[in-house]
Every structure is written in C-alpha cells, then in structure tokens.
C-alpha cells in the first residue's frame, strides 16, 4: 500500500560483493538483453504512475462519508458515518485513507478503488472469503459516486498502524539491524498467513513485499494486506507473468512463465526475510533483466534443468557460468545456520523444490517462537502464533501438526485439546 522502495537501495552491497566477478557479470548483463524478457511495458508503467486520485472522492480530512449496512437477524439497515482523517497510501489502484467511525469511535482504513464497469472486482470477492489472524480483515464495503458519475468501491478494513517496510527503515536510519526475534516473528507470520491462503483458499497473493505487510507495533502481530493482485490459480490456466514488485519477483516470472504456482509467494517471502536480515533489498534490480542479474550474482547461474523448471523456452540460452556467492559474505556477519538453511529453501530456482508455507512454519529457525517462555524484548507475550483453526490443519499429516503446534499451545487450543 506504500510507494515502492527506491531502486538505489542495496547497490553498494552488490558492488562490494562482486568485485571479482564484475567482468562475468557485465557479460551476463549484455548477453541477457537478447533474451526478450517480458518486463512491464510503458503502458503498465504509465498505469503505475497515474496521479493520485484524491480530489472529490471523500478523502479530504474532515470529510464525512455516510453509508448503510444490512441489518443483522432481520433488523432494519443501519447507518454508519466515517470521518476521513488522512491518506496513508496511494498507488495505481487508488488510495487508502484512515478514518474514524462516528458512531463507535473505531479507527479503520478505507481503500478506495475506481471501479471499472467492464470488470468485476476480484479483490472484493477474495476479501469476503478471508478470515485469518495474519490477514487484514474486511469489515464491510460500499460504493460511492462522484459528480462525474465515476463509481468507486470502498473497502473498509481494520486499521493496523505500521508496515514491515516502515519498521525496517526505522532500523536502517539508526544504522541498526532488526533484532533477530522480530525477523523470526514477521517471517513466521507471513508463512502462516500464506499457508492459509495457499492451502485453505487456493489463493496466490502475487505481491508479497514489506509494504504489503501490516504490523501492530505494540503486539508485533503481522497481517498480509493488499489483495489487488491476488488470484486463485487453476492448473493449466495461464496467468500474467508481469506481476509482483520487482525486488520480490520470483525468477520464473522474470522468465515469463504463465503457469506458475503459489511458490512465487514463497520466493517473495525469502526476499522479505533476507531484506530484514540485511537491512536493504537482497536483489535490487533496476529492470526485469537486471533483476535476474542480481539473483544470479548471489545464487549463481541456474542449471539447464532449473531453467527448464522456470520456463522451458529458455533451456537453449547460453548463460555465462557464475558461481554462487557464499551467504556469510552476502550478509557480512554471522547468521545462525538455521537462517541460512531456511533462505536456501526459499531461494530455489526450481519452484517445485521451494519449501511450502507449512514446511517453512515448522523450520528450526522458528523454534525460539515455540518456547513456552518466549517473550518480546520488552517482556510482553508474543502475538498469537498457534491459534490454528481446524480448516488450517486439515490435510496436514499428524507428525507435521505435532511440530506445528507446541504442547503448551495445544492445551490452550480447544480444538487441539480434543484431538491430542
């Protein structure tokens, strides 16, 4: 929901880490210009840089928006009024502004999207079916009309004051790295949210990035937001490949694959985790081709088999052979071996070799979170991490459930207590 990170971030890391391979990398960059990799077209970029839609759509501070909600249990419709406070995010989709409910005093976020009459709004349909502790909650929705007869869809969402992006930048400004406990907390909650989206809803988010991860700064509960790019992926049906913000885009998307899977979200999660550990984006590409160059500089050249798994059309392309960069040199500090192992599971060129979201949740990197005595640095309890509903655990092998839900959490979870 925020604007993108600047492309310059992280370039010093790239230059510092690749002095000895600069000639190979230059060759790689030149050669790969011939690949005709599908990046965003000029039309796409124009759509991304449209002027913010603010005037006359009810987001001015103090503007009152009144709507009616269906009554519950046969009761009459209820009138609800929101007072706009200030804009918290803008983009090609429209805008998000903070508002307060006059009747209850509750603070909400309202996402206002220009409704194209030619298309049904997929985001609304998706959000109406979501219910999870790590997914932002849709309270209700309504349409509004301007003097020009333009129709806007308004999604009234729970308000979460911070994002992972702003939280990470606050550490960068102080020249500090984010404490490891927060890296674990945020990455785990992304994975748990994705496990729900992927397994329970068959949904791929397609734009996981720090700006789309909301965080409560007091509890450190994380919620995935912005389902404007999300889609239920159907095997055999093609999808657009130029989705997902560049730094977090899986290599198969850069290669133009159209029959990708939810594994693209797993790659993006690895990019977020690495960014939190590093203090800046791991793969700061300046174009589609340059993004692939950045990935190869760290992971090395993909094998022919790996390229085939990403997009069979490129198996004959001759890539210069570049060796992988050791992780301890990438991060220039000692990382726990569990962190390195999890990153390796996220960053597989072959989508089918990446770990699933559930497999990530049971990874030893998160064992500290399963300790019954684990606390936030200020001594407060951790946010709810193990309050699984039956739907979340459906189809998961019993031995995986045992690793997923620690014993102390089973006693607190009524469903788990009945089945343990």
Curated annotation (Swiss-Prot):
EC number: 2.7.11.1
Source organism superkingdom: Eukaryota
Boundaries of every Protein kinase domain copy: 82-366
Modified residues (Phosphotyrosine): 242
Gene: ASK4
Protein name in UniProt: Shaggy-related protein kinase delta
PTM section of the record: Autophosphorylated mainly on threonine and serine residues.
Comp. bias regions, Polar residues: 10-26
């Amino acid at each position: 929901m925020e604007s993108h990170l600047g492309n310059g971030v992280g370039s010093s890391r790239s230059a510092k880490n690749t002095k000895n391979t600069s000639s190979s990398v230059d060759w790689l960059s030149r050669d790969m210009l011939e690949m005709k990799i599908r990046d965003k077209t000029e039309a796409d970029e124009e759509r991304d840089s449209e002027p913010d839609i603010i005037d006359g759509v009810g987001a001015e501070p103090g503007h009152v928006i009144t709507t009616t909600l269906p009554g519950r249990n046969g009761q009459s419709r209820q009138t609800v009024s929101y007072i706009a406070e200030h804009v918290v995010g803008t983009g090609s989709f429209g805008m998000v502004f903070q508002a307060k409910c006059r009747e209850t005093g509750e603070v909400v976020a309202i996402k206002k999207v220009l409704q194209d009459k030619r298309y049904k709004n997929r985001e609304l349909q998706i959000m109406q079916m979501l219910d999870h502790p790590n997914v932002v909650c849709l309270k209700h929705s309504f349409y509004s009309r301007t003097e020009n007869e333009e129709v806007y869809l308004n999604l009234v969402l729970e308000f979460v004051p911070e994002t992972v992006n702003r939280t990470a930048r606050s550490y960068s400004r102080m020249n500090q790295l984010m404490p490891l406990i927060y890296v674990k907390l945020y990455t785990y909650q992304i994975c748990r949210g994705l496990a729900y989206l992927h397994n329970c809803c068959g949904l791929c988010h397609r734009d996981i990035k720090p700006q789309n991860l909301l965080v409560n700064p007091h509890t450190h509960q994380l919620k995935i937001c912005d389902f404007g790019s999300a889609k239920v992926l159907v095997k055999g049906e093609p999808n657009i490949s130029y989705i997902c913000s560049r730094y977090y885009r899986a290599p198969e998307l850069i290669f133009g694959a159209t029959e990708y899977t939810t594994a693209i979200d797993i790659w993006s999660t690895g990019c977020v985790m690495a960014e939190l550990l590093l203090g800046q984006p791991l793969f700061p590409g300046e174009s589609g081709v340059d993004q692939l160059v950045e990935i190869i500089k760290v992971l090395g050249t993909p094998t022919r088999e790996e390229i085939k798994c990403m997009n069979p059309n490129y198996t004959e392309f001759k890539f210069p052979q570049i060796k992988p960069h050791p992780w301890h040199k990438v991060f220039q500090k000692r990382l726990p071996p569990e962190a390195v192992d999890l990153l390796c599971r996220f960053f597989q060129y072959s989508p089918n070799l990446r770990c699933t979201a559930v497999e990530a949740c049971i990874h030893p990197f998160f064992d500290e979170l399963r300790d019954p005595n684990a606390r936030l640095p200020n001594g407060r309890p951790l946010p709810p991490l193990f309050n699984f509903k039956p739907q979340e655990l459906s189809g998961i092998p019993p031995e995986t459930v045992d690793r997923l839900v620690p014993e102390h959490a089973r006693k607190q979870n009524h469903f788990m207590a009945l089945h343990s």
